[in-house]
Each structure stands twice: as structure tokens, then as C-alpha cells.
């Protein structure tokens, strides 16, 4: 169970006070219920991946404006692991969350005209932070740390300025079947086998849609259309160790919104260019941090 108070970044006039209540929305609060699982402490896998854990969570958010923003509920996967062990009972951990948030009050020209940050009832939920984890007893852990959160719909609907918070987190963890020796330094640790480096191949196919702002004169208008986005990544990856791999990727994408234009004197109608102006092919360098069931990917495209 966790409680997270957070500061709302004032990224729009709506959040700064241009709203129905004529006051800035500076603070948000959330409560979370989470369930996770992990390998048995002091095993080989537990030592390699820093006591990594993963699970599912449910969060309820209150931003102080139910009428214009709503009180969304987030459903998400999460994963975390130890960064450093400070004592036998105290560690510094990282954790990230990724999922879907539902129950927003989106922008509407007539019923919710001030809301310039959220354009859809469902939005992506992304959270990451670091925290101290103190093993109080065999059953109970206490956690405290800092965390950042982002909500947006990925340009699938306008407006999409999104909402961002930064704050604290405090929580209590109940462990159902943790061994007694998990709280002390073990007399024996399972040896970690030497890693044999090898080459693997990743193939990713993806598809989505997006909205786009189109230039008309000296300003932009929101195109009334939703545009298809399709693509692939093919990446040979060299596995350097248990937790890190790197390589290059061949990346291709078709973006139906690319180079969309208007014709002066022909209103706000949007036109698509020829197909070759909406295709892209390139290569990127990649590095991945492996976290048991998940990998964290960073890419530098050319």
C-alpha cells in the first residue's frame, strides 16, 4: 500500500489558474494497492538481478478538480530492483510503473472548454522513481522515496499537453512467505555462473495512430483526421552480461501524418503527399538493461 503526494507542474494556463475555479492546481494525491512476486532471496537469480520484483498495481488520483479533470484510476504493471545495499536491512531501490489511466474528464468545446491538457478519457500512465526500502521484520517493509509521473494519450487525440507531477511516496509492504534468513547476511551464497556472451535477434512490429497540427499561414491548426503509423525494428543484439546488451537496429516507419499540408486559399483542408514522402528507413544504436521479465531500451537513431 502506498500514498503519493505530488506537485503538479504548471505547464499550461489551465493548470496555472485559467479554469472554472480561477485558481492554480498545484498538488495531486494518490493511493495505490500493489501485488508483486520475486525470486527466493539469496538465490542465484536474486543476486544477479538485485532482488528484482514485478507485479500489478491499482492507483486512485485526486488533482483537486473532479469537474474538469476527473479522479482517474490507473491500472499498471511495475518492476523494481535494488540499486545499492546500505545495510543488511536497508537498500536503495528503483521502480517504474507503466499502464493505463481511466476516468478523465477530457476537453470539450462546450462542456469542458478550459481543459487544455487532457483530450481523452483514457491516457497512458508512466511513473518512475527511487526509494529506500527498510526490512522491519520478516513480514513488514517500509518504503519512502521520490517519484515522477506523466499522463498523456500519445497524440491520439487533441489536446495532448499531458499532466506531469513530481513528489514523494511512502508505503508499507506485507511479505507473505519471506524466509527468516532474508533479514541477515547469509552464511552461504549461491555462486553466480560465468556469463557466456552471445548474439540474439529482436524483431518488433508496431502500429498506432496519431493526430497532427498542420501549418496554415503563420500558425498551426489541428487536423481533423487521425493518421495511421506502422513500423518495424530489427536488431541484432550482443549480450555482454546478465543485465546488459547492446547492438544496432534497422528501423522503418510509415507515418501517414508526415508532410501533410494545406493549400493557401483553399480553407483548412489537409492534403497528403506522395507515399515516398511518408516513409522513413534508418539505423540506430541500442543499449538495453535486462530486468528478468522486462528490458529497458535506449536508442540513438541516425
Residue positions per predicted region:
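Short glycine/proline- and aromatic-enriched beta-strand/turn motifs that initiate or cap beta-hairpins
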Residues: 1-40, 173-177, 183-237
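Transmembrane beta-strands of outer-membrane beta-barrel pores
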Residues: 3-9, 37, 58-64, 98-106, ...
Amino acid at each position: 500500500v502506498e500514498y503519493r503526494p505530488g506537485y503538479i507542474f504548471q505547464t499550461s494556463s489551465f493548470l496555472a489558474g485559467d479554469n472554472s475555479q480561477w485558481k492554480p492546481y498545484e498538488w495531486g494525491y494518490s493511493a495505490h494497492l500493489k501485488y508483486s512476486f520475486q525470486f527466493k532471496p539469496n538465490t542465484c537469480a536474486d543476486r544477479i538481478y538485485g532482488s528484482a520484483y514485478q507485479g500489478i498495481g491499482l492507483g486512485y488520483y485526486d488533482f483537486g478538480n473532479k469537474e474538469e479533470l476527473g479522479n482517474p484510476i490507473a491500472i499498471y504493471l511495475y518492476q523494481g530492483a535494488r540499486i545499492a545495499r546500505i545495510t543488511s536491512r536497508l537498500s536503495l531501490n528503483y521502480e517504474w510503473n507503466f499502464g493505463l489511466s481511466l476516468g478523465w474528464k477530457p476537453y470539450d468545446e462546450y462542456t469542458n472548454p478550459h481543459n487544455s491538457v487532457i483530450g481523452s478519457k483514457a491516457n497512458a500512465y508512466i511513473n518512475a522513481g527511487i526509494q529506500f526500502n527498510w526490512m522491519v521484520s520478516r513480514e513488514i517493509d517500509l518504503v519512502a522515496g521520490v517519484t515522477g509521473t506523466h499522463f498523456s494519450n500519445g497524440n491520439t487525440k487533441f489536446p495532448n499537453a499531458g499532466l506531469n507531477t513530481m513528489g514523494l511516496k511512502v508505503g508499507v509492504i506485507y511479505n507473505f512467505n519471506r524466509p527468516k534468513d532474508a533479514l541477515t547476511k547469509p552464511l552461504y551464497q549461491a555462486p553466480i555462473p560465468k556469463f557466456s556472451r552471445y548474439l540474439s535477434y529482436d524483431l518488433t512490429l508496431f502500429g498506432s495512430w496519431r493526430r497532427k497540427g498542420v501549418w496554415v499561414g503563420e500558425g498551426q491548426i489541428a487536423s481533423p483526421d487521425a493518421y495511421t503509423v506502422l513500423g518495424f525494428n530489427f536488431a541484432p543484439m550482443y549480450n555482454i552480461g546478465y543485465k546488459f546488451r547492446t547492438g544496432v537496429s534497422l528501423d522503418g516507419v510509415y507515418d501517414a501524418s508526415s508532410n501533410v499540408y494545406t493549400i493557401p486559399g483553399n480553407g483548412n483542408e489537409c492534403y497528403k503527399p506522395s507515399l515516398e514522402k511518408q516513409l522513413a528507413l534508418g539505423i540506430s544504436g541500442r543499449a538495453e538493461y535486462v530486468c528478468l521479465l522486462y528490458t529497458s531500451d535506449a536508442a540513438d537513431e541516425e
